[in-house]
Amino acid sequence: MIFQTPLVTGRLERRYKRFLADVTLDDGRFITASVPNTGSMLGLTAPGSRVWLSVSDAPHRKYAHTLQIVEADNTLVGVNTGLPNRIAEEAILNSLIPDLAGYASLKREQKYGRNSRIDLLLDDGPRQRAYVEVKNVHFIRTLGLAEFPDTVTARGAKHLDELVDVVAAGHRGVMLFIIQRNDCSRFSISGDLDPTYARAFERARANGVEAWAVRCHITDKSIDASELVPIE
C-alpha cells in the first residue's frame, strides 16, 4: 500500500478527543491533525514522538493532515485503522497467505451475521466461501510480541461469535490480524486486557474459525504485508 503523496514529519504534542492530535511539524508550523484510529493507541501517544502525516488539499476537509505513522520503541508503527483492509486484500491477492490464495472473487464490506459487514468475502463457486474479518494490531509489551486487543472490545467478541455461525453454516470463517509495525515476530491475544475477547477467540478457534497474523513492513513511503507470524 503506497502512500499517494509524500508524508510530512513532525513531533507529537498530544492526542485528544480520540480523533485529534496536535503536532509541531519539522518546518516549525503547529497544526492539528485528524487521527484515524478509534482505539486507545496504548504506548503510541507519548509527547515528543516522531510522527509522519499525509496531507490532503481537498476543500471539504476540516483538517488537511492525517496521522499515519508514529515512531515508538525505535520502530515505525502504522496507526491508521483504515488501512489494514487494503493491506489484507493485497496480502491475499499476492498469495502471502497460501490457504486464502486462488479465490476467483474478492468482495469488500459484505453484509452478514447480526447487522454486521464482513471486511472481505472470498468466493469461488465450488470452494467454500471465506468470510475474512480484519483487525489492526500495533500494541506490544514484550519485545517481538504483538498483542490484540489493547483495550476492551465488545464489538470484536461479537465478530468472533458471528464467524462461528459462518463456520456452522458450512463456510470458512477467518480472523486476519494485520500487525502494523516492523519489530514483531509473534502474535498473541492479550487476555488480561480483555478476558471476554480472549474467551471468544478460544471458542472460535475450537469451533473451526481460522486465524492468521501478518506482519507489515513500514516505511515513510508504503506499508506492505511482509510475512506470516505464529500465533501463540
UniProtKB/Swiss-Prot annotation:
Query: Which one Pfam family would you cite for this protein?
Result: SfsA
User: What GO molecular function annotations does the UniProt record carry, in alphabetical order?
Assistant: DNA binding
InterPro entries referenced in this protein's UniProt entry, alphabetically: SfsA (IPR005224), SfsA_C (IPR040452), SfsA_N (IPR041465)
Q: Family assignment?
A: Belongs to the SfsA family.
- The molecule here is called Sugar fermentation stimulation protein homolog
What species was this sequence derived from? Brucella anthropi (strain ATCC 49188 / DSM 6882 / CCUG 24695 / JCM 21032 / LMG 3331 / NBRC 15819 / NCTC 12168 / Alc 37)
